[in-house]
Regions:
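Glycine/threonine-rich phosphate-binding loop and adjacent beta-strand/alpha-helix elements that clamp
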Residues: 4, 76, 313-315, 325-578
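Alpha/beta-hydrolase fold nucleophile elbow
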Residues: 136-149
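Short beta-strand/loop motif that positions the catalytic acidic residue
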Residues: 269-271
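Accessory cap/linker subdomain of secreted extracellular hydrolases
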Residues: 52-56, 60-78, 82-89, 94, ...
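Conserved alpha/beta-hydrolase
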Residues: 89, 93-109
Length: 578
């Protein structure tokens, strides 16, 4: 790969700049900076999606949907330099920022072995940050701003405390490799194996002209080298197999997760109510647990990538970075610590809070009974049970219609008393909203257009709690050992349900579905995005259908138990009207 520079579209662009790592390997970066000589703050990203692959070329269905619905995304830019889940330099360089995009080891223009989220990747990223901080065009203040992968690795690299890292914006970025990303409640997510096939192998370094060619400049996206399929395979991990080989939370997961007491840099953590199954939990946990004294939380809706690129998102990001990277005395320090786009059935309303979870929350228990109801009272005084197929559709508990508009915003928890005919059981928990006409109300999630209001998961053998980290509103499971069931034995299970926000109209009601498999919206009309294998039916690509992980042990009968001493309940965060 040859480095060269040009002045184009009102920017000085340095293509394929080498950055040498401590082991001698050279990563490649594209650098977009102001034409006027000077020193500027730097926004850097490091990731696998190929810096030379235009957003609209690599992800056409996501791009077309976003561009059509949100014209402010494309306005004011040629869009030739748009790249998946990182900033558009044409919207940042004119405001005095340098934008640096680094292809991670083994991807795009960078050679090497692909090992996602490993300590090697994290240390590469740290070295790139320190490199950017001392370049002639840098003022020494480096920030990170990106979505998803480019958010996840912010938590990781900040845990290593690079000296030039002065601020970061984690836009929809998970933080716990086990709990957020690979094993929901101990149940294997098949997302990463499919993601690896669709979004990484397609841009692996060494594809050369056999790979994609940038539609705007005609350059090979994956470098000039052309390796055989055997050589390509040697140069990458077997990602899905590696994840499956680590079913418990151990060093493999811990080195790919945030170290909260080491994260001290100012940050803005931006989550998505529809980010069930990947990112939302990481954004809220980061805000609660990171050691940083200057930290803010924002939660929005719509697709995973949309608000990052809209005027709403870009303006928020610029206010934050202008203060911390440029030293501008703007109004950022007056920004309330929490900014929520509170979700209604027909849109969102912005509201500020001072903390998360919201301090004025009325934590409300809704008890389930054997009449398939949810209410504020314990109705079962005698022992009883309901049994369902352990991999089936499960059972539904219905609340009474709400007699007034009611807001639920925050994390949730579910207590159950469970037995199985086998040694284990997987529980999939779905909180759903229905209209006064008995029609289910679903939302555009981070990926899926049929997303319910909240979900949670737990494998019975993973029910052990970390007592130090658990809270009534967020059970925290250790996942370091298995406690298998004796068939017929009744055990207590506390299930974490990821945060949500919904203002429930008068006359609408909630339904709690407890299932043995992933949720599917009954009214879903099959849809796909170009970068995912599966149809979108309610859970997006975040499925739990691996036949090795969910073998015959999970295919028996599951029973829920009721009684005065076994009163299952859903803990709801009801927000009083102000």
């Amino acid at each position: 790969v040859k480095e060269f520079s040009e002045i184009k579209d009102s920017m000085h662009i340095d293509w394929d700049v080498p950055i040498k790592m401590d082991d001698g390997l050279e990563l490649r970066a594209d650098i977009f900076r102001p034409i006027k000589e000077g020193v500027y703050p730097v926004l850097i990203t490091y990731g696998p999606y190929a810096k030379g692959l235009p957003f609209q070329q690599g992800y056409p269905s996501a791009w077309d949907r976003m561009a059509e619905k949100h014209p402010d995304v494309t306005r004011g830019s040629s869009n030739k330099y748009q790249n998946w889940e990182v900033v558009d330099p044409e919207k940042w360089v004119p405001d005095g920022y340098v934008c640096v995009r680094v292809d991670s080891r083994g991807c795009g223009a960078s050679p090497g072995y692909i090992d996602h989220f490993s300590m090697r990747e994290t240390m590469d990223f740290k070295e790139c940050i320190e490199w950017a901080g001392v370049q002639l065009w840098s003022n020494g203040n480096v920030g990170i701003n990106g979505v998803s992968y480019f958010g996840i690795n912010q938590w990781q690299v900040a845990s290593q405390q690079p000296s030039h890292l002065k601020a970061m914006c984690i836009w929809e970025g998970a933080s716990d490799w086990y709990r957020d990303m690979t094993h929901h409640g101990g149940i294997l997510s098949t997302f990463w194996a499919n993601w690896f096939d669709m979004q990484v192998k397609t841009v692996q370094h060494g594809l050369g002209k056999n790979g994609m060619i940038n539609q705007f400049n005609g350059r090979p996206i994956c470098g000039n080298d052309e390796l055989s399929e055997e050589q390509l395979e040697v140069n990458r991990c077997s990602f899905g197999d590696e994840i499956r080989a680590h079913p418990l939370n151990n060093q493999y997961h811990e080195e790919r997760s945030a170290v909260w007491d080491k994260i001290t840099v100012p940050f803005l953590s931006a989550g998505n109510w529809g980010g069930q199954g990947l990112h939302l939990r990481g954004n809220t946990e980061g805000f609660i647990r990171a050691a940083s004294e200057q930290k803010w939380l924002e939660i929005h809706g719509l697709e995973h990538w949309t608000e990052f690129y809209t005027d709403y998102g870009v303006n928020l990001q610029k206010r934050f970075f202008d203060h911390f990277l440029k030293g501008i005395k703007n109004d950022w320090l007056d920004q309330p610590k929490v900014q929520l786009q509170v979700r209604h059935i027909d849109g969102f309303k912005k509201r500020h809070e001072t903390e998360w979870p919201i301090e004025r929350t009325t934590w409300t228990k809704m008890y389930m009974n054997d009449a398939y109801e949810m209410s504020g009272e314990i109705k079962n005084t005698d022992s009883s049970s309901i049994t369902f197929d352990a991999m089936g559709d499960g059972i539904d508990f219905k609340s009474r219609p709400f007699d007034e508009e009611t807001e639920i915003t925050g994390p949730m928890a579910l207590k159950l008393f469970v037995s199985s005919s086998t040694e284990d059981a997987d529980l999939f928990v779905v909180l759903r909203l229905f209209s006064d006409q008995d029609n289910e109300v679903v939302f555009q999630g981070a990926v899926d257009p049929y997303t319910p209001i909240a979900q949670g998961w737990l494998r019975a053998s993973h029910r052990k709690l970390d007592q130090q980290l658990s809270r009534p509103w967020r059970p925290y499971h250790s996942h370091t050992e298995k406690a298998v069931l004796n068939p017929g034995e009744i055990v207590e299970m506390d299930i974490e349900i990821w945060p949500t926000s919904i203002v429930i109209p008068k006359g609408y009601y909630l339904m709690l579905s407890i299932q043995g498999k992933d949720y599917e919206c009954p009214d879903a009309q099959p849809q796909k995005l170009s970068n995912f294998k599966n149809q979108l039916k309610g859970c997006g690509p975040f499925l739990h259908n691996d036949p090795i992980d969910r073998d015959a042990r999970f295919n028996g009968q599951t029973s829920l138990h009721f009684g005065e001493s076994r009163a299952p309940y859903l803990l709801l965060p009801i927000i009083p009207k102000q």
